[in-house]
């Protein structure tokens, strides 16, 4: 079965020194784990921390791109892809396709030339913001600076439509998502998140926005992040006082959800959006804790069986696991 992950943070770990050609103990993603998990294509996100602004943010994006290029070119069974045809070609040759996204449009500054250059270098979606409001729009964890899209953000949406760059509304405020739905002539993507009706995390989207993205032809990618999956776990983690890096202790908390919680969010998204508008966007390598039994990308091959046991048809499962996003791409 073809499997596509619409969001992982591999470049961030690459630039920190991880060799993705090796099977790294305790890592969530590397090329051997992608192969074991049956993952045929994965979007590697060029993540820009909110603390970086202007030229510093842009320089960081290009540094991530350079290191990602170096490592992909070293792996004999991985190759870049920029469209559905190249993904299919890689698949026929037994290669994992690495696609590129930019996470946090602050790296664009207010310069469409940077946008077009990144597109020419293979970047196919831009996550408009991250953990803070930026020059484009409000974040779901921001201060509501613009009340949605900024004036530049509205111009950017139109320019992204023009060049064929996908607009990713993960991390956006509800008001930003509504503005994008109103302005964009092309389908939106929500590359990594879950259903707010099942778990109240601010990064999750309410049913009406999930439905509106689907109605516009877009795809919503369900994440594996436990705090998106379970309010009980998010609450227990917060009260535990555990800090970043205490991964083993986070995994030992009794409320840690498993694959069944991810299946529940996928099933809810199918109910709200229709099965042809749901995908998988794990957020691996960008999260400090994973669901029980899904510690790495090597476990993604377990998901189709779990969805079948939940009652989904083979054709719906094939769409969710990757064909839906590939169709949009």
Residue ranges and their predicted role:
Residues 10-27, 47-59, 109, 133-149, ...:
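Acidic/histidine-rich helix-loop elements
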Residues 2-5, 40-45, 97-100, 125-128, ...:
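Structural recognition of the beta-strand scaffold that forms the well-ordered cores
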Residues 222-224, 273-296:
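Short acidic/histidine-rich active-site segments
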């Amino acid at each position: 079965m073809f499997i596509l992950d619409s969001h992982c943070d591999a470049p961030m770990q690459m630039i920190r020194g991880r060799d993705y050609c090796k099977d790294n103990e305790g890592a969530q993603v590397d090329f051997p784990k992608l192969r074991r998990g049956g993952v045929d294509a994965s979007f590697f996100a060029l993540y820009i921390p909110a603390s970086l602004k202007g030229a510093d943010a842009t320089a960081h994006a290009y540094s991530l791109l350079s290191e990602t290029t170096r490592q992909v070119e070293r792996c004999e069974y991985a190759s870049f892809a920029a469209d559905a045809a190249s993904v299919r070609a890689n698949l026929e040759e037994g290669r994992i396709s690495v696609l590129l996204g930019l996470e946090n449009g602050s790296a664009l500054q207010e310069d469409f030339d940077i946008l077009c250059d990144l597109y020419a270098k293979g970047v196919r979606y831009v996550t408009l913001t991250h953990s803070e409001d930026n020059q484009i729009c409000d974040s779901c964890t921001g201060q509501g600076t613009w009340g949605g899209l900024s004036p530049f953000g509205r111009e950017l949406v139109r320019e992204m439509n023009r060049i064929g760059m996908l607009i990713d509304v993960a991390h956006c405020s509800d008001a930003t998502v509504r503005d994008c739905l109103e302005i964009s002539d092309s389908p939106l993507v929500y590359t990594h998140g879950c259903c707010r009706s099942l778990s109240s995390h601010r990064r999750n989207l309410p049913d009406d926005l999930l439905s509106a993205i689907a109605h516009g032809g877009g795809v919503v990618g369900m994440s594996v992040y436990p705090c998106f999956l379970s309010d009980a776990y998010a609450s227990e983690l917060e009260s535990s006082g555990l800090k970043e890096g205490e991964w083993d202790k986070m995994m030992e908390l009794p409320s840690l959800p498993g694959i069944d919680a991810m299946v529940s969010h996928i099933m809810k998204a199918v109910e709200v959006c229709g099965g042809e508008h749901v995908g998988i966007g794990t957020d691996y390598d960008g999260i400090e804790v994973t669901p029980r039994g899904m510690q790495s990308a090597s476990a993604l091959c377990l998901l189709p069986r779990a969805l079948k046991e939940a009652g989904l048809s083979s054709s719906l499962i094939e769409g969710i696991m990757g064909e839906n996003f590939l169709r949009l791409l």
